[in-house]
């Protein structure tokens, strides 16, 4: 099965950019416009990594991650946010986020984190 990444982002232009870059890197890319849509999609289509924004309509990234962890999901979650305060970062990690990036960031850093996750996943 191909490595699958879900992008959870309410800004369509940002979703398109992530999709373009990740697809060109060889990943299967799923998309959702907010946490609620992501949970609905994940109910039928699993993924390996979720890249999620924090603040979105209906359900934000932190609430989505809390719900996933309550469902015993072990999916790897990378949160990206423009609200990069130490308290926000702690809040995200307590909710179950695996990695945290503050916008703006270099896409190469995000791609490297995804690559490292898949490299470690391959190790028996």
Predicted region positions:
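Receiver (REC) domain active-site loop signature in two-component systems and cognate sites
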Residues: 56
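C-terminal output helix
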Residues: 87, 105-115
């Amino acid at each position: 099965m191909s490595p699958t990444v879900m992008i959870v982002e309410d800004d369509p232009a940002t979703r398109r950019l992530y999709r373009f870059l990740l697809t060109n890197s060889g990943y299967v890319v799923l998309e959702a416009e907010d946490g609620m849509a992501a949970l609905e999609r994940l109910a039928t289509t699993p993924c390996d990594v979720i890249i999620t924004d924090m603040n979105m309509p209906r359900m934000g990234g932190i609430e989505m991650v809390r719900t996933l962890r309550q469902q015993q999901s072990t999916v790897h979650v990378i949160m990206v946010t423009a609200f990069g305060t130490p308290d926000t970062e702690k809040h995200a990690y307590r909710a179950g986020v695996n990695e945290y990036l503050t916008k703006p960031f270099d896409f190469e850093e995000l791609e490297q984190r995804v690559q490292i996750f898949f490299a470690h996943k391959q190790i028996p």
